[in-house]
């Protein structure tokens, strides 16, 4: 596969950078929509997203570099060439969570509600970002045959062709992870829609459990894994994240929800206040109209009664006068 989309002079625009950018944009859109649905000020989502993306990418790169110091010590500038690949998602997740934690403390907002907003964006972004690995011809599995790949039925022909590297076919583990992340995204959306009594943080735990479970098994096929002595680093981190998130999910089931105020959308509040004021004014006007109409009716009735009584008095006085004259 050709990793370069196009060139403008000496500047290369690579597929890897393109898919990372698309993943970030899609993630922002999803987070903003969910924030709006929860009536959270979009400035909070923007600020949180900005810092999380920046430090998340830095964390993913730092994690990768630390496991490949022997490569980068000979070419220090290669550390900054992110378009060549070399982002480890676990580093991004860990630093991203730390960033959101610090952000929530500074803004005095609920961290778990923010991570619940981010979780669907992150897993979908991971699915999109894996296509950058495809064009870089990286993150693949062991050697296999064309027949084996075709027998799986779920792998498109263009992916199979792209997995032929130097005349040899490899397992497209990037594609397996793409499908797993896509499935995880659908599951999270369904749980978020139908599990109404969930606690803040359970969506985050669900994301970590789903991704860690899939990554553990897919990593066993990877041939370019980062290693901790004789263990694959991604599998070790996946086990830790799965166990920790599972325990925390159970704890949240029995924990009372503590409502921490998050700055809500001012525009929506203003509109609601205006509508409430309009309704109050309309009710007041209706009351005024009713009171004035009732007053007018009472005045008319008193006038009628007074005229009737006066006419009766005059008639009675006339009768008495006639009687006296007689």
Each language-model region and where it sits:
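Intrinsically disordered, polybasic Lys/Arg-rich low-complexity tracts
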Residues: 282-326
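A feature for loop-to-transmembrane-helix boundaries and adjacent hydrophobic helices
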Residues: 1-284, 326
């Amino acid at each position: 596969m050709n990793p370069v989309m196009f060139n403008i002079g000496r500047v290369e625009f690579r597929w890897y950078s393109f898919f990372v950018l698309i993943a970030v944009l899609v993630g922002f859109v999803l987070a903003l929509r969910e924030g709006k649905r929860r009536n959270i000020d979009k400035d909070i989502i923007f600020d949180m997203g900005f810092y999380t993306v920046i430090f998340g990418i830095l964390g993913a790169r730092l994690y990768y570099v630390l496991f490949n110091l022997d490569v980068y010590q000979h070419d220090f500038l290669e550390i900054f060439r992110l378009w060549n690949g070399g982002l480890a998602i676990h580093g991004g997740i860990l630093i991203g969570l730390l960033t959101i934690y610090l952000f929530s403390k500074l803004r005095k907002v609920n961290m778990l509600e923010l991570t619940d907003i981010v979780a669907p964006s992150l897993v979908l972004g991971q699915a999109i970002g894996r296509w950058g690995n495809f064009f870089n011809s990286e993150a693949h599995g062991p050697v296999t045959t064309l027949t084996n790949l075709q027998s799986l039925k779920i792998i498109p022909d263009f992916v199979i062709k792209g997995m032929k590297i130097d005349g040899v076919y490899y397992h497209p583990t990037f594609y397996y992870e793409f499908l797993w992340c896509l499935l995880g995204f659908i599951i999270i959306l369904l749980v978020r829609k139908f599990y109404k009594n969930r606690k803040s943080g359970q969506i985050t735990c669900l994301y970590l459990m789903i991704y860690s479970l899939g990554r553990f098994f897919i990593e066993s096929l990877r041939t370019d894994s980062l290693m901790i002595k004789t263990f694959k680093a991604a599998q070790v981190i996946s086990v830790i994240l799965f166990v920790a998130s599972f325990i925390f999910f159970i704890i949240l089931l029995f924990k009372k929800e503590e409502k921490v105020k998050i700055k809500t959308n001012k525009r929506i509040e203003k509109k609601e206040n205006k509508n409430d004021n309009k309704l109050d004014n309309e009710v007041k006007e209706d009351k005024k109209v009713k009171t004035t109409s009732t007053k007018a009716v009472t005045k008319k009735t008193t006038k009628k009664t007074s005229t009737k009584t006066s006419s009766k008095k005059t008639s009675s006085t006339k009768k008495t006068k006639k009687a006296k004259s007689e």
